Every structure is written in structure tokens, then in C-alpha cells.
Amino acid sequence: LHFFDGRIAQVQALKVAVLGTDSAVGKRTTAWLLVDAFRTAGRRAELVGTGQTAWLQGARHSLILDSLINDFVSGEIEHAVWSCWEDGRPDVIVLEGQGSLLNPAYPGGFELLAAGRPDVVVMQHAPARREYDGFPGNRLHDLPTQIRAVELISGRRVGAVTINHEDLDAAGIEAARAAITAETGLPAFDVLREGADGLCRALSPWLHEADARRGSGVAGRDG
């Protein structure tokens, strides 16, 4: 097991964290689709998995977050991301989120922000969901509040919103996308229906920053 030691600053790949507004909302699926989209675009991309399923699905650089003693969580996240960078020098590393920052039972995400230090965050959201999954009476915090919480804690921007379209028909999906963009100013994508190419393009400003960083040999903003 590893303690956090700051070597995350050596990682010059674009780091994208896929977080969510709830548990069981589609973060891992979106993360895989984003990896595939970057690869299709000719980029070397890897997923750092944080749960059992991503590990079973073949994410080479993974950790099982809920099996760790708390003292080692940050260090193991850092080690997984750093090892991913050292092993293949990918252009992009996508970090799979767990739970959600404001979830009363599974308050995941802070560790990824603190130790993984993503350059940008993608927020997965189920527009039709009103309560936290499995906890009736616990109203889901609204999307702008959850975005503000992530940005305040991380000092990084949420660059896009991805939609879990449960309980929405085609018209409802398009209405939800338009409402999210109007409310947050962010592009919204249903990657399960349309793939993640558009999401990949929306993240291009951060990718270009990472390319410039590698070209100049300068470490990231935390280095």
C-alpha cells in the first residue's frame, strides 16, 4: 500500500475525472466510452478504475476503493494514476468516480479530486432522478449546486455534463440537454445514445493544454 507523496505532479497526461451527482448513475460506462472516443481520435487513452467492475472489465490500472483502509486511499489513487503514466505515457487518463460528493451514504469523489488532481471534470447526471439512489426522502442536490461543490473543492472546472437518460423518452432527453445547458452554460451529452465523440471534442481545450505541457516539459499546475 502507498501513502500520498506528491508524485502525481509528474503526470503530464490530460487527467479527466468522471464524477456524478449520485451513485449508480453511469460514471463507469461514460468513462469507458470516453476512453474509446479518445482512442478513435488517435489518442492514447487509459482508464484508471476505482471499483470492482472496472477491474473485472480489464482496466489495467485499477484500485478497489472500498477495500482500502482510509489512510491509504489517496496514496493508492495517486499510485494508480502515476503508474498508468509511467507504464505507457498516455495522452489521456480517465478516472472513474465513485458515489457522489454530496451523497449521504456514498460520499465519493473528494479522494479523486484531492489525490488524482484532474485537469477537468465531467459530471454524470440523471435529470429525472429526484432522490438519492436507494434512499427515499433524501432529495438529490440540484446539478448547479453539485457542480459548484466540485469546482470549489478541486479548483478545477466541470467541462461538460453527461446524461443518464433513465425514465426519459427521446423528447425528454433533448429537453433535459437544453435545460442543462441553459442552467449551467455547459454542453450536455447522452453518450450512451450518441457515443462520446462530441464529449471528446468538448474537452479539446484541456487536451491542448496538456499537449503543450508535455511539449515544454513543464509539469502540471500542481507541480
Identify the role of each PLM range.
Residues 53-70:
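P-loop NTPase switch/communication element
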Residues 41-54:
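Short beta-strand-centered segment that lines the nucleotide-binding/catalytic pocket of NTP-utilizing
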Residues 1-14, 74-86, 91-193:
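Conserved catalytic-core segment of NTP-binding enzymes
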Residues 3-41:
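Walker A (P-loop) phosphate-binding motif
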